[in-house]
From Swiss-Prot:
<dbReference type="GO" id="GO:0004824">
    <property type="term" value="F:lysine-tRNA ligase activity"/>
</dbReference>
<keyword id="KW-0030">Aminoacyl-tRNA synthetase</keyword>
<keyword id="KW-0460">Magnesium</keyword>
<keyword id="KW-0436">Ligase</keyword>
<dbReference type="GO" id="GO:0006412">
    <property type="term" value="P:translation"/>
</dbReference>
<keyword id="KW-0547">Nucleotide-binding</keyword>
<protein>
    <recommendedName>
        <fullName>Lysine--tRNA ligase</fullName>
        <ecNumber>6.1.1.6</ecNumber>
    </recommendedName>
</protein>
<comment type="similarity">
    <text>Belongs to the class-II aminoacyl-tRNA synthetase family.</text>
</comment>
<keyword id="KW-0067">ATP-binding</keyword>
<keyword id="KW-0963">Cytoplasm</keyword>
<dbReference type="GO" id="GO:0046872">
    <property type="term" value="F:metal ion binding"/>
</dbReference>
<dbReference type="GO" id="GO:0005737">
    <property type="term" value="C:cytoplasm"/>
</dbReference>
<keyword id="KW-0479">Metal-binding</keyword>
<dbReference type="GO" id="GO:0005524">
    <property type="term" value="F:ATP binding"/>
</dbReference>
<comment type="subunit">
    <text>Homodimer.</text>
</comment>
<keyword id="KW-0648">Protein biosynthesis</keyword>
């Protein structure tokens, strides 16, 4: 879940 959020932020 956190990984997906990180990608979205980028």
């Amino acid at each position: 879940l956190k990984s997906e959020l990180k990608e979205d932020k980028e």
